[in-house]
Amino acid sequence: MELEKTGIVTRVKNIKDFFVLTIADREQLEVLSKEFYNVGDVITAKGETQLRGETLQIVAKEVKKESEEKRKRICDEIEKSVRVLENEPIIKTEVMKKLIPHAREVAKKLLVAKKLNRFTILRFHADADGIVGGIAISSILNAQKFQQNSAIYSVRDALTDINSARNNFMPLVILVDFGANEESISGLELLKADGIETIVIDHHPPAKNIEQYACFLSPWKFGEENASKHTAGYIAIEVARACGMDFEKYVKTSLAGDKSDLLPFEDEDKNKALVLDYLATYSSFGNSLDFYREVMEKPALYESMLRQAKEKLENLKESVKANLKKREKDGITIYLLNLDRIATKGEFPSRGKITSIAYDMVKGENAIVLGYSEKYIIFRVTDEAAKKVNANEIIEKIKSSAPDFIESGGGHDKAASLKIRKGFEKEILEEIVKII
């Protein structure tokens, strides 16, 4: 059967005597052409059709390059054709009522990107919340997926992504559960300078100028009270729901992973989050989102990993208790924990998780736990202490008073961390105690 089709060239491969051109209109197909065309060109191809697996191909007899105006028309038609679902949010807070229309806008962007076959990079943070968000977003469109072990989108990350995006069609970078902080701005600025569109889905306190560099989906845009409790994984699930994907079963896993109380969750939700955190620790072994999903759906493997994770946490409790040092200041108890005596690099649990073990031991008190190592100081603030102490505010003061010793820092009001120059942890700890 002969077919004539007009579309935007989104990918080019060279196979023997032909160039295989992937073209996008409202659908995608391949054109076998003896002539080369650049990614982004609009062509009209005419020829006989054939199937390669499930992919329709046109073996071109004629190929004509079209005008730039045609390209704009195709993009506009695709955008007009895309519809998203207008679901009620799963969590019915004032923040979500305001955020949900913006989640639908992001959903539409992603569906349009899928129809246009845009080159997409998805980076998700290496914890239960970030992984849940990554699973939700990756269900919407094809993307190169990377686990991000740092809370910062660095200049190095940006240069890696810029290099990967070279010669690809309308590149798009999506960051989930990280990338909104001040330290990420330099990396985001490079993406913008190279013309790469960026979407950041994050629930951490953001840099003031984040929206100059990215489409920013965040609860912080709609008020600070309880903003961080609206986890990035949950927000990503709402984006996926607007695209017709159902990941409601992962909402409480995301909340449990970040100890958010917006919905009540069961021990099973905590266990799922624990398994994801356990797996994320070993990301150097090439974990993928598909792997995380498969583990959650294989009962024997899931139970084995859950047992190992719980055993490791239980075995550390006595060591944590023995290494906690106690100080008092203005009615607040400050617990200091030397993490280098307990943590093993590259092994579960992480320094943050070990600090949380100490926090769980004292969470009923008016207390702050400061876990420290050669390069990090980790904050955990109990509910009672949080009435007077804000971890993020302390970090900002430390950044101002000792900028030469601080590499980065931030997080939530009751759970945050500082990265410091090696060997200065004692001096910075004393500064923190003074501020408290």
Locate predicted features.
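Beta-strand/loop nucleic-acid-binding surfaces
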Residues: 24-39
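An N-terminal, well-structured beta->alpha segment
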Residues: 68-123, 139
